[in-house]
Amino acid sequence: MNINEPRDGGGFVLPFFNDSKKSRKSHAGRDSLKSNRVPFTKWVPDTVSYTTKPLKNAHRWLHLHNKTRNHFVATVAEFAGTTLFLFFAFSGTQVALLATPANDSNVVGTPSNPAQLLYVSLCFGFSLAVNAWVFFRISGGLFNPAVTMGMCIVGALPYFRGLLLIFAQIIGGIAAAAIVSALFPGPITFRTSLGGGTSIVQGLFIEMFLTAELVFTIFMLAAEKHKGTFIAPIGIGLSLFIAELTGVYFTGGSVNPARSFGPSVVSGQFTGYHWIYWVGPILGAILASAFYKFIKMLEYETANPGQDAGRVGEVIDPEAQAIKNRVSFASEGLVGRELDESGASHVHENGNHFGAPKEYGTKRRPFSDSPAPPNANDQFAGLSEGGLHTDEFANENIGGGHSGEGAMHRNKRDSEGTLVGNGKKGVLKVGAGGTGGAAVGSTNENLRDNTHNN
Protein backbone atom coordinates (compact mmCIF):
# COMPACT_ATOMS: atom_id res chain seq x y z
CA MET A 1 0.00 0.00 0.00
CA ASN A 2 1.30 3.45 -0.94
CA ILE A 3 1.72 5.83 1.98
CA ASN A 4 2.39 8.86 -0.23
CA GLU A 5 -1.10 9.89 -1.32
CA PRO A 6 -1.64 12.81 -3.74
CA ARG A 7 -2.88 16.16 -2.47
CA ASP A 8 -4.96 19.04 -3.75
CA GLY A 9 -3.08 21.85 -5.41
CA GLY A 10 -1.10 19.69 -7.84
CA GLY A 11 1.54 18.62 -5.34
CA PHE A 12 2.60 15.32 -3.85
CA VAL A 13 3.71 14.12 -0.45
CA LEU A 14 7.27 13.05 0.13
CA PRO A 15 8.50 11.60 3.42
CA PHE A 16 9.00 14.35 6.02
CA PHE A 17 6.92 16.78 3.91
CA ASN A 18 3.42 15.62 4.83
CA ASP A 19 0.73 18.31 5.11
CA SER A 20 -2.33 17.01 6.94
CA LYS A 21 -4.38 20.11 6.03
CA LYS A 22 -4.51 19.16 2.36
CA SER A 23 -7.25 16.82 1.20
CA ARG A 24 -6.61 13.84 -1.01
CA LYS A 25 -7.33 13.81 -4.72
CA SER A 26 -7.93 11.23 -7.44
CA HIS A 27 -5.16 9.08 -8.85
CA ALA A 28 -6.58 9.33 -12.37
CA GLY A 29 -4.03 9.46 -15.13
CA ARG A 30 -1.05 8.61 -12.96
CA ASP A 31 -0.17 5.46 -14.91
CA SER A 32 0.75 7.58 -17.92
CA LEU A 33 3.41 9.41 -15.89
CA LYS A 34 5.56 6.50 -14.78
CA SER A 35 8.68 8.49 -15.48
CA ASN A 36 7.71 10.73 -12.53
CA ARG A 37 7.08 7.88 -10.12
CA VAL A 38 8.16 8.60 -6.57
CA PRO A 39 11.18 6.36 -5.88
CA PHE A 40 10.54 3.15 -3.94
CA THR A 41 6.76 3.62 -4.13
CA LYS A 42 3.96 2.61 -6.50
CA TRP A 43 2.52 6.11 -6.75
CA VAL A 44 2.90 8.52 -9.68
CA PRO A 45 1.96 12.15 -8.98
CA ASP A 46 -0.41 13.83 -11.43
CA THR A 47 1.53 17.10 -11.35
CA VAL A 48 4.39 18.53 -9.40
CA SER A 49 4.26 21.57 -7.17
CA TYR A 50 7.07 24.10 -7.26
CA THR A 51 5.86 26.02 -4.22
CA THR A 52 8.70 24.83 -2.02
CA LYS A 53 12.36 24.29 -2.77
CA PRO A 54 12.42 20.67 -1.52
CA LEU A 55 9.59 19.72 -3.89
CA LYS A 56 11.19 21.55 -6.79
CA ASN A 57 14.45 19.72 -6.25
CA ALA A 58 12.59 16.43 -5.85
CA HIS A 59 10.84 16.95 -9.18
CA ARG A 60 14.14 17.58 -10.94
CA TRP A 61 15.58 14.46 -9.36
CA LEU A 62 12.58 12.38 -10.40
CA HIS A 63 13.19 13.27 -14.03
CA LEU A 64 16.89 12.45 -13.88
CA HIS A 65 17.02 9.43 -11.64
CA ASN A 66 15.10 6.88 -13.75
CA LYS A 67 17.81 6.12 -16.29
CA THR A 68 20.44 5.87 -13.58
CA ARG A 69 18.17 3.71 -11.48
CA ASN A 70 17.56 1.34 -14.39
CA HIS A 71 21.30 0.97 -14.99
CA PHE A 72 21.78 0.35 -11.29
CA VAL A 73 19.05 -2.30 -11.12
CA ALA A 74 20.40 -4.10 -14.19
CA THR A 75 23.95 -4.02 -12.84
CA VAL A 76 22.95 -5.37 -9.44
CA ALA A 77 20.84 -8.10 -11.04
CA GLU A 78 23.67 -9.09 -13.36
CA PHE A 79 26.07 -9.31 -10.43
CA ALA A 80 23.63 -11.47 -8.46
CA GLY A 81 22.85 -13.65 -11.47
CA THR A 82 26.49 -14.18 -12.39
CA THR A 83 27.34 -15.00 -8.80
CA LEU A 84 24.56 -17.58 -8.52
CA PHE A 85 25.26 -19.09 -11.94
CA LEU A 86 28.96 -19.56 -11.26
CA PHE A 87 28.43 -20.56 -7.63
CA PHE A 88 26.42 -23.63 -8.61
CA ALA A 89 28.68 -24.36 -11.59
CA PHE A 90 31.84 -24.09 -9.45
CA SER A 91 30.24 -26.14 -6.69
CA GLY A 92 29.42 -28.93 -9.11
CA THR A 93 32.94 -28.88 -10.49
CA GLN A 94 34.39 -28.99 -6.98
CA VAL A 95 32.24 -31.99 -6.13
CA ALA A 96 33.08 -33.81 -9.37
CA LEU A 97 36.83 -33.44 -8.94
CA LEU A 98 37.00 -34.05 -5.19
CA ALA A 99 34.68 -37.07 -5.14
CA THR A 100 37.38 -39.36 -6.57
CA PRO A 101 38.88 -42.63 -5.33
CA ALA A 102 41.10 -42.27 -2.27
CA ASN A 103 44.20 -43.44 -4.17
CA ASP A 104 43.81 -40.65 -6.73
CA SER A 105 45.79 -37.80 -5.22
CA ASN A 106 45.89 -35.59 -8.29
CA VAL A 107 42.40 -34.12 -8.22
CA VAL A 108 43.23 -30.54 -9.15
CA GLY A 109 42.94 -29.74 -12.85
CA THR A 110 40.69 -30.64 -15.75
CA PRO A 111 38.30 -33.63 -15.42
CA SER A 112 39.90 -36.82 -16.68
CA ASN A 113 37.03 -39.28 -17.13
CA PRO A 114 33.65 -39.18 -18.93
CA ALA A 115 31.63 -39.26 -15.71
CA GLN A 116 33.38 -36.15 -14.42
CA LEU A 117 33.06 -34.44 -17.80
CA LEU A 118 29.33 -35.11 -17.91
CA TYR A 119 28.80 -34.00 -14.31
CA VAL A 120 30.68 -30.73 -14.79
CA SER A 121 28.95 -30.02 -18.10
CA LEU A 122 25.52 -30.63 -16.61
CA CYS A 123 26.27 -28.31 -13.69
CA PHE A 124 27.27 -25.46 -15.99
CA GLY A 125 24.42 -25.98 -18.46
CA PHE A 126 21.65 -26.35 -15.89
CA SER A 127 22.95 -23.52 -13.73
CA LEU A 128 22.97 -21.16 -16.72
CA ALA A 129 19.49 -22.21 -17.84
CA VAL A 130 17.92 -21.70 -14.42
CA ASN A 131 19.59 -18.41 -13.55
CA ALA A 132 19.19 -16.94 -17.04
CA TRP A 133 15.48 -17.74 -16.81
CA VAL A 134 15.30 -16.01 -13.44
CA PHE A 135 17.22 -12.85 -14.34
CA PHE A 136 16.55 -12.29 -18.05
CA ARG A 137 13.59 -10.00 -17.29
CA ILE A 138 15.81 -7.74 -15.20
CA SER A 139 19.23 -7.54 -16.80
CA GLY A 140 19.02 -9.94 -19.72
CA GLY A 141 20.69 -12.79 -17.85
CA LEU A 142 23.94 -12.62 -19.83
CA PHE A 143 26.50 -13.54 -17.10
CA ASN A 144 29.34 -13.47 -19.63
CA PRO A 145 31.50 -10.53 -20.80
CA ALA A 146 31.90 -12.11 -24.24
CA VAL A 147 28.13 -12.46 -24.66
CA THR A 148 27.63 -8.89 -23.46
CA MET A 149 30.18 -7.65 -25.97
CA GLY A 150 28.40 -9.51 -28.76
CA MET A 151 25.04 -8.02 -27.77
CA CYS A 152 26.58 -4.56 -27.94
CA ILE A 153 28.11 -5.22 -31.36
CA VAL A 154 24.78 -6.25 -32.91
CA GLY A 155 22.98 -3.32 -31.31
CA ALA A 156 20.88 -5.29 -28.85
CA LEU A 157 22.48 -3.56 -25.86
CA PRO A 158 23.77 0.01 -25.35
CA TYR A 159 27.52 0.18 -24.90
CA PHE A 160 27.32 2.02 -21.60
CA ARG A 161 24.96 -0.59 -20.16
CA GLY A 162 27.26 -3.26 -21.57
CA LEU A 163 30.27 -1.84 -19.73
CA LEU A 164 28.33 -1.82 -16.47
CA LEU A 165 27.23 -5.43 -16.97
CA ILE A 166 30.75 -6.59 -17.81
CA PHE A 167 32.04 -5.02 -14.61
CA ALA A 168 29.26 -6.73 -12.63
CA GLN A 169 30.00 -10.08 -14.29
CA ILE A 170 33.70 -9.96 -13.45
CA ILE A 171 32.98 -9.07 -9.83
CA GLY A 172 30.34 -11.80 -9.74
CA GLY A 173 32.86 -14.37 -10.94
CA ILE A 174 35.26 -13.39 -8.16
CA ALA A 175 32.48 -13.48 -5.57
CA ALA A 176 31.29 -16.93 -6.67
CA ALA A 177 34.81 -18.37 -6.53
CA ALA A 178 35.38 -16.85 -3.09
CA ILE A 179 32.11 -18.26 -1.71
CA VAL A 180 32.82 -21.77 -3.01
CA SER A 181 36.38 -21.62 -1.71
CA ALA A 182 35.11 -20.62 1.73
CA LEU A 183 32.26 -23.14 1.91
CA PHE A 184 33.86 -26.29 0.52
CA PRO A 185 36.93 -28.08 1.91
CA GLY A 186 40.03 -28.74 -0.11
CA PRO A 187 41.87 -26.71 -2.73
CA ILE A 188 40.09 -24.95 -5.58
CA THR A 189 39.61 -27.45 -8.40
CA PHE A 190 37.63 -25.35 -10.83
CA ARG A 191 40.41 -23.21 -12.31
CA THR A 192 40.66 -23.48 -16.09
CA SER A 193 43.81 -24.95 -17.58
CA LEU A 194 44.91 -26.71 -20.74
CA GLY A 195 44.82 -30.50 -20.68
CA GLY A 196 45.14 -33.51 -22.93
CA GLY A 197 48.26 -32.18 -24.62
CA THR A 198 46.41 -29.11 -25.95
CA SER A 199 48.68 -26.33 -27.20
CA ILE A 200 48.07 -22.66 -26.48
CA VAL A 201 47.04 -21.98 -30.09
CA GLN A 202 44.67 -24.94 -30.06
CA GLY A 203 43.20 -23.80 -26.78
CA LEU A 204 42.68 -20.30 -28.16
CA PHE A 205 40.70 -21.52 -31.16
CA ILE A 206 38.75 -24.07 -29.12
CA GLU A 207 37.61 -21.26 -26.85
CA MET A 208 36.82 -19.06 -29.85
CA PHE A 209 34.59 -21.57 -31.65
CA LEU A 210 32.81 -22.78 -28.52
CA THR A 211 32.05 -19.19 -27.53
CA ALA A 212 30.85 -18.37 -31.04
CA GLU A 213 28.36 -21.22 -30.85
CA LEU A 214 27.06 -20.03 -27.48
CA VAL A 215 26.81 -16.38 -28.52
CA PHE A 216 25.04 -17.18 -31.79
CA THR A 217 22.55 -19.34 -29.90
CA ILE A 218 21.77 -16.37 -27.66
CA PHE A 219 21.34 -14.11 -30.70
CA MET A 220 18.84 -16.42 -32.37
CA LEU A 221 16.88 -17.45 -29.28
CA ALA A 222 16.95 -14.31 -27.14
CA ALA A 223 17.97 -11.28 -29.21
CA GLU A 224 15.59 -12.33 -32.00
CA LYS A 225 12.05 -11.99 -30.67
CA HIS A 226 9.73 -14.83 -31.64
CA LYS A 227 7.14 -17.11 -30.13
CA GLY A 228 9.78 -19.28 -28.47
CA THR A 229 11.72 -16.47 -26.82
CA PHE A 230 10.25 -17.23 -23.41
CA ILE A 231 11.96 -20.64 -23.36
CA ALA A 232 15.25 -19.32 -24.75
CA PRO A 233 17.11 -20.03 -21.46
CA ILE A 234 16.61 -23.76 -22.03
CA GLY A 235 18.27 -23.64 -25.43
CA ILE A 236 21.02 -21.39 -24.11
CA GLY A 237 21.69 -23.75 -21.22
CA LEU A 238 21.85 -26.71 -23.59
CA SER A 239 24.25 -24.76 -25.79
CA LEU A 240 26.61 -24.27 -22.87
CA PHE A 241 26.18 -27.94 -21.92
CA ILE A 242 27.34 -29.01 -25.39
CA ALA A 243 30.22 -26.54 -25.31
CA GLU A 244 31.36 -27.85 -21.93
CA LEU A 245 31.19 -31.46 -23.08
CA THR A 246 33.55 -30.55 -25.91
CA GLY A 247 35.90 -28.15 -24.18
CA VAL A 248 36.23 -29.11 -20.51
CA TYR A 249 38.87 -31.76 -21.08
CA PHE A 250 41.03 -29.61 -23.38
CA THR A 251 40.73 -26.07 -22.00
CA GLY A 252 38.54 -26.33 -18.92
CA GLY A 253 35.57 -25.14 -20.99
CA SER A 254 35.71 -21.48 -20.07
CA VAL A 255 33.87 -19.66 -22.93
CA ASN A 256 33.51 -16.91 -20.31
CA PRO A 257 36.31 -14.60 -19.13
CA ALA A 258 34.59 -14.07 -15.77
CA ARG A 259 34.47 -17.83 -15.24
CA SER A 260 38.27 -18.10 -15.60
CA PHE A 261 39.25 -14.81 -13.98
CA GLY A 262 37.37 -15.32 -10.69
CA PRO A 263 39.02 -18.60 -9.61
CA SER A 264 42.45 -17.31 -10.64
CA VAL A 265 42.01 -14.21 -8.48
CA VAL A 266 40.81 -16.18 -5.46
CA SER A 267 43.54 -18.82 -5.75
CA GLY A 268 46.21 -16.27 -6.63
CA GLN A 269 47.42 -18.45 -9.50
CA PHE A 270 47.48 -17.20 -13.08
CA THR A 271 48.87 -19.43 -15.82
CA GLY A 272 51.09 -17.91 -18.47
CA TYR A 273 48.38 -18.54 -21.07
CA HIS A 274 45.51 -17.07 -19.03
CA TRP A 275 45.04 -14.53 -21.81
CA ILE A 276 43.49 -17.14 -24.10
CA TYR A 277 40.44 -17.20 -21.81
CA TRP A 278 39.90 -13.55 -22.67
CA VAL A 279 41.02 -13.36 -26.29
CA GLY A 280 39.34 -16.62 -27.35
CA PRO A 281 35.82 -15.75 -26.12
CA ILE A 282 36.12 -12.19 -27.44
CA LEU A 283 37.08 -13.48 -30.89
CA GLY A 284 34.19 -15.93 -30.68
CA ALA A 285 31.76 -13.12 -29.89
CA ILE A 286 33.05 -11.11 -32.85
CA LEU A 287 32.73 -14.14 -35.14
CA ALA A 288 29.16 -14.84 -34.03
CA SER A 289 28.23 -11.17 -34.37
CA ALA A 290 29.63 -10.99 -37.90
CA PHE A 291 27.73 -14.08 -39.01
CA TYR A 292 24.54 -12.85 -37.36
CA LYS A 293 24.77 -9.50 -39.13
CA PHE A 294 25.48 -11.30 -42.40
CA ILE A 295 22.32 -13.42 -42.28
CA LYS A 296 20.30 -10.42 -41.12
CA MET A 297 21.55 -8.47 -44.12
CA LEU A 298 20.33 -11.32 -46.35
CA GLU A 299 16.94 -11.33 -44.56
CA TYR A 300 17.20 -14.95 -43.48
CA GLU A 301 13.49 -15.00 -42.57
CA THR A 302 12.56 -15.42 -46.24
CA ALA A 303 14.61 -18.62 -46.64
CA ASN A 304 12.40 -20.76 -44.41
CA PRO A 305 9.09 -18.94 -43.89
CA GLY A 306 6.36 -19.92 -41.46
CA GLN A 307 8.62 -20.80 -38.53
CA ASP A 308 6.59 -18.67 -36.12
CA ALA A 309 3.19 -19.94 -37.25
CA GLY A 310 1.04 -20.63 -34.20
CA ARG A 311 -2.07 -22.18 -35.77
CA VAL A 312 -2.93 -24.69 -38.46
CA GLY A 313 -3.21 -22.79 -41.69
CA GLU A 314 -1.32 -19.74 -40.46
CA VAL A 315 1.59 -18.73 -42.63
CA ILE A 316 3.95 -15.94 -41.66
CA ASP A 317 4.79 -13.36 -44.29
CA PRO A 318 8.60 -13.78 -44.38
CA GLU A 319 9.26 -10.28 -45.69
CA ALA A 320 7.07 -8.75 -43.01
CA GLN A 321 8.78 -10.91 -40.39
CA ALA A 322 12.17 -9.68 -41.56
CA ILE A 323 11.01 -6.10 -41.16
CA LYS A 324 9.41 -6.83 -37.82
CA ASN A 325 12.68 -8.28 -36.49
CA ARG A 326 14.53 -5.10 -37.43
CA VAL A 327 12.19 -2.44 -36.12
CA SER A 328 9.72 -1.97 -33.30
CA PHE A 329 6.04 -1.57 -34.00
CA ALA A 330 3.16 -0.27 -31.91
CA SER A 331 1.56 -2.83 -29.62
CA GLU A 332 -1.55 -3.04 -31.80
CA GLY A 333 0.43 -3.59 -35.00
CA LEU A 334 0.07 -7.22 -36.08
CA VAL A 335 2.28 -7.37 -39.15
CA GLY A 336 2.09 -9.81 -42.06
CA ARG A 337 0.48 -12.74 -40.27
CA GLU A 338 -0.42 -14.59 -43.47
CA LEU A 339 0.78 -14.88 -47.04
CA ASP A 340 -0.32 -17.18 -49.89
CA GLU A 341 2.50 -19.18 -51.38
CA SER A 342 2.02 -17.38 -54.71
CA GLY A 343 -0.36 -14.55 -53.86
CA ALA A 344 0.03 -11.02 -52.62
CA SER A 345 0.89 -10.09 -49.06
CA HIS A 346 -1.38 -8.17 -46.75
CA VAL A 347 -1.17 -6.14 -43.59
CA HIS A 348 -3.06 -5.44 -40.42
CA GLU A 349 -4.20 -1.88 -39.83
CA ASN A 350 -6.24 -1.41 -36.64
CA GLY A 351 -7.25 -5.04 -36.80
CA ASN A 352 -8.54 -4.99 -40.41
CA HIS A 353 -6.96 -6.89 -43.30
CA PHE A 354 -6.19 -4.80 -46.35
CA GLY A 355 -4.73 -6.07 -49.57
CA ALA A 356 -5.23 -7.03 -53.18
CA PRO A 357 -4.83 -10.18 -55.29
CA LYS A 358 -1.70 -10.85 -57.26
CA GLU A 359 -3.26 -10.04 -60.65
CA TYR A 360 -3.68 -6.42 -59.59
CA GLY A 361 0.08 -6.15 -59.23
CA THR A 362 -0.23 -4.96 -55.64
CA LYS A 363 2.05 -6.46 -53.06
CA ARG A 364 1.44 -4.29 -50.04
CA ARG A 365 4.18 -3.92 -47.49
CA PRO A 366 3.42 -3.57 -43.75
CA PHE A 367 1.98 -0.21 -42.81
CA SER A 368 1.93 0.93 -46.43
CA ASP A 369 0.89 4.51 -47.16
CA SER A 370 -1.26 3.43 -50.11
CA PRO A 371 -5.02 3.68 -49.56
CA ALA A 372 -7.07 0.73 -48.43
CA PRO A 373 -9.35 -0.98 -50.99
CA PRO A 374 -13.09 -0.31 -50.81
CA ASN A 375 -14.98 -2.17 -48.11
CA ALA A 376 -11.72 -3.40 -46.65
CA ASN A 377 -13.45 -5.35 -43.90
CA ASP A 378 -14.93 -7.63 -46.60
CA GLN A 379 -11.71 -9.33 -47.63
CA PHE A 380 -11.13 -9.73 -51.37
CA ALA A 381 -10.92 -13.20 -52.90
CA GLY A 382 -8.02 -14.51 -54.93
CA LEU A 383 -7.63 -14.96 -58.66
CA SER A 384 -5.68 -17.56 -60.62
CA GLU A 385 -2.81 -17.96 -58.19
CA GLY A 386 -4.54 -17.02 -55.00
CA GLY A 387 -5.05 -13.77 -53.23
CA LEU A 388 -5.55 -12.83 -49.63
CA HIS A 389 -7.47 -14.41 -46.84
CA THR A 390 -8.32 -13.60 -43.26
CA ASP A 391 -7.60 -14.97 -39.81
CA GLU A 392 -8.99 -14.50 -36.34
CA PHE A 393 -7.38 -11.09 -35.97
CA ALA A 394 -9.61 -9.50 -38.63
CA ASN A 395 -12.78 -7.67 -37.64
CA GLU A 396 -15.83 -9.86 -38.34
CA ASN A 397 -13.75 -12.09 -40.59
CA ILE A 398 -13.16 -14.94 -38.14
CA GLY A 399 -12.36 -18.19 -39.89
CA GLY A 400 -12.37 -16.70 -43.38
CA GLY A 401 -10.36 -18.28 -46.14
CA HIS A 402 -10.31 -19.85 -49.58
CA SER A 403 -12.57 -22.72 -50.59
CA GLY A 404 -11.58 -25.36 -53.07
CA GLU A 405 -12.82 -23.20 -55.95
CA GLY A 406 -11.36 -19.99 -54.65
CA ALA A 407 -14.52 -18.28 -53.43
CA MET A 408 -14.28 -15.89 -50.50
CA HIS A 409 -16.74 -15.49 -47.65
CA ARG A 410 -17.10 -13.90 -44.23
CA ASN A 411 -17.41 -16.01 -41.09
CA LYS A 412 -19.48 -18.79 -42.61
CA ARG A 413 -18.94 -22.49 -41.95
CA ASP A 414 -21.15 -25.54 -42.25
CA SER A 415 -21.34 -28.29 -39.64
CA GLU A 416 -18.33 -30.09 -41.08
CA GLY A 417 -16.11 -27.02 -40.99
CA THR A 418 -16.06 -26.38 -44.74
CA LEU A 419 -16.21 -22.85 -46.07
CA VAL A 420 -18.96 -21.40 -48.23
CA GLY A 421 -18.64 -18.45 -50.65
CA ASN A 422 -20.28 -17.03 -53.77
CA GLY A 423 -22.92 -19.71 -53.55
CA LYS A 424 -20.32 -22.43 -53.92
CA LYS A 425 -19.27 -24.90 -51.28
CA GLY A 426 -15.66 -25.97 -51.20
CA VAL A 427 -13.23 -27.84 -48.98
CA LEU A 428 -10.87 -25.81 -46.83
CA LYS A 429 -7.34 -26.23 -48.16
CA VAL A 430 -5.27 -25.90 -44.97
CA GLY A 431 -6.91 -25.17 -41.65
CA ALA A 432 -8.59 -21.84 -41.01
CA GLY A 433 -7.57 -19.45 -43.72
CA GLY A 434 -5.82 -21.88 -46.02
CA THR A 435 -2.68 -21.42 -48.07
CA GLY A 436 -1.73 -21.80 -51.67
CA GLY A 437 -4.49 -19.62 -53.05
CA ALA A 438 -7.42 -20.50 -55.31
CA ALA A 439 -7.84 -21.68 -58.87
CA VAL A 440 -10.80 -19.46 -59.67
CA GLY A 441 -12.35 -16.66 -57.68
CA SER A 442 -14.08 -13.33 -57.83
CA THR A 443 -12.87 -9.99 -56.56
CA ASN A 444 -16.25 -8.36 -57.10
CA GLU A 445 -17.80 -8.04 -53.67
CA ASN A 446 -21.16 -7.18 -55.27
CA LEU A 447 -21.49 -10.81 -56.37
CA ARG A 448 -21.91 -11.94 -52.78
CA ASP A 449 -25.40 -12.60 -51.60
CA ASN A 450 -26.72 -11.79 -48.15
CA THR A 451 -25.98 -15.29 -46.88
CA HIS A 452 -22.27 -14.63 -47.07
CA ASN A 453 -22.43 -11.51 -44.94
CA ASN A 454 -23.48 -13.38 -41.81
UniProtKB/Swiss-Prot annotation:
An example Gene Ontology CC term for this record: plasma membrane
Membrane topology field: Multi-pass membrane protein
Record-linked InterPro entries: Aquaporin-like, Aquaporin_transptr, MIP
Sequence ranges on the Extracellular membrane side: 93-115, 185-202, 251-274
Keyword hit for Transmembrane: yes
Knocked-out gene: effects: Leads to a slight reduction in the vegetative growth rate and delayed conidiation.
Domain of life: Eukaryota
Chief place where the protein resides: membrane
Family according to the record: Belongs to the MIP/aquaporin (TC 1.A.8) family.
Function: Water channel required to facilitate the transport of water across membranes. Involved in conidiation.
Protein name: Aquaporin-7
Organism: Botryotinia fuckeliana (strain B05.10)
